[in-house]
């Protein structure tokens, strides 16, 4: 069932720009129509409430959509949007050959690690001017653990002639707070890199709609 025109966010977007839309309005714009007994704004609001956030929505599996009125076609489109965002940030980083700000770094890492069901440890390798040489998913693990080998990071950095690295991994559980093991492995990597005159600029832990930066907390 279509929402009345006054409820559609399309006019608001055309008048004030896409950035003026709330998360609910943006989702309603994507959904276009509601379902019997529920207009599109109500459907969008309920769907976001169930998933907790846009992050939760885009990383959810299809089982979580059952009973919402969103079918397999819309689910596939949502997953496509998430993948487009991931590839956009990757293409942007590779084109500009740089991460120009902490915010851009965070957004890129969130786009790469959001929705992963296992812990992934990713490393960004940078040259002496902090331009991106390459980023690699060096290690993958289980739901709550990933085995990290500092020597593999060093080997790749030397091969690429990197002067600095940024570390990142995700917590599929959603909580970005670093564990004791996260802190210990970061210390090990930092010490190994210092020995080879390679700087560790940061280690970001990506959770569900949140993150923790070791550099921002003064741990690096």
Swiss-Prot record:
Q: What family is this protein classified in?
A: Belongs to the UPF0758 family. YicR subfamily.
**Where does the MPN domain lie?**
98-220
The UniProt GO MF terms for this protein read: metal ion binding; metallopeptidase activity
Keyword Protease attached: yes
- Keyword Metal-binding attributed: yes
GO terms of biological process kind: proteolysis
Q: Which PANTHER family match?
A: DNA REPAIR PROTEIN RADC, UPF0758 PROTEIN YEES-RELATED
Species for this entry: Citrobacter koseri (strain ATCC BAA-895 / CDC 4225-83 / SGSC4696)
Which protein are we looking at? UPF0758 protein CKO_05095
Q: Where does Zn(2+) bind?
A: 169, 171, 182
Query: Keyword annotations for this protein?
Result: Hydrolase, Metal-binding, Metalloprotease, Protease, Zinc
- Look up the domain of life of the source: Bacteria
Q: Where is this motif: JAMM motif?
A: 169-182
């Amino acid at each position: 069932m279509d929402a009345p025109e006054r409820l559609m966010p399309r006019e608001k977007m055309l008048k004030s720009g896409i950035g003026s839309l709330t998360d609910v309005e943006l989702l309603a714009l994507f959904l276009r129509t509601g379902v019997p007994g529920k207009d599109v704004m109500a459907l969008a609001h309920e769907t976001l409430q169930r998933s907790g956030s846009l992050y939760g929505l885009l990383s959810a599996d299809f089982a979580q959509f059952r009973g919402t009125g969103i079918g397999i076609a819309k689910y596939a489109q949502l997953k496509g949007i998430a993948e487009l965002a991931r590839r956009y940030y990757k293409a942007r980083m590779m084109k500009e050959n740089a991460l120009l700000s902490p915010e851009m770094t965070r957004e890129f890492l969130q786009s790469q690690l959001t929705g992963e069901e296992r812990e992934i440890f990713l490393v960004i390798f940078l040259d002496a001017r902090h331009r991106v040489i390459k980023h690699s998913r060096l290690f993958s693990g289980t739901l709550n653990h990933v085995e990290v080998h500092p020597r593999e990071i060093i080997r790749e950095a030397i091969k690429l002639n990197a002067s600095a690295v940024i570390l990142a991994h995700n917590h599929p559980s959603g909580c970005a707070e670093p564990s004791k093991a996260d802190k210990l492995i970061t210390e090990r990597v930092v010490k190994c890199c210092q020995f080879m005159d390679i700087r560790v600029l940061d280690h970001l832990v990506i959770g569900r709609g949140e993150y923790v930066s070791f550099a921002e907390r003064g741990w690096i």
